[in-house]
Amino acid sequence: MFGISCVYGIMFPLRYEEEISYASETYDVDPVFVASVINSESGFNKDVVSSKGAVGLMQLMPSTAEYLAEKLNYGEYDLKLPEDNINLGTYYLSILLEEFKDETLALCSYNAGPTNVHKWLNNEEYSKDGKTLDVIPFNETKNYVDKCQKAMKYYKHKRNYFAIENF
């Protein structure tokens, strides 16, 4: 019989801790936040490619990765390499967190794009104050945010319980 910790270990795997810690420190993003995005985007499968063409652990679109790499003067990269994918994806998360000043909005933007999030914030049907969302209009994005938040809760608990250094 499988125990609850085994089930959680399957639902919320944790790999590439060194790469996550490095990128998180470099771009000042909570590693738990990064791990939750990776879990939700790819389940920590570095080789996954979506039907829309998003690649790797953080499911970056090649055009987005190219833009990010240019901004960073990153040089050559391979989105299937965990180090490159996590560095570029974490840098993108840092941009979204800086722009929106809110983890939920950053997650919405990572999934649905910043243009959609700005439209939602400017629509009283979705946002009463123009700063937070009362309703996430895309079901896919709402489910994505919920999945990331569940993963964050688990990874925060794991970090505190096991006192994982730099994580």
Residue positions per predicted region:
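Residues that scaffold the ATP/ADP-binding catalytic core of kinase and kinase-like folds
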Residues: 47, 67-69, 120
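Catalytic and substrate-binding regions of cell-wall glycan-acting enzymes that process beta-1,4-linked
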Residues: 106-162
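Second-shell loop/turn segments in exported
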Residues: 6-10, 20-23, 46-55, 73-82, ...
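Substrate-binding/active-site groove segments that recognize
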Residues: 52-72, 88-92, 114
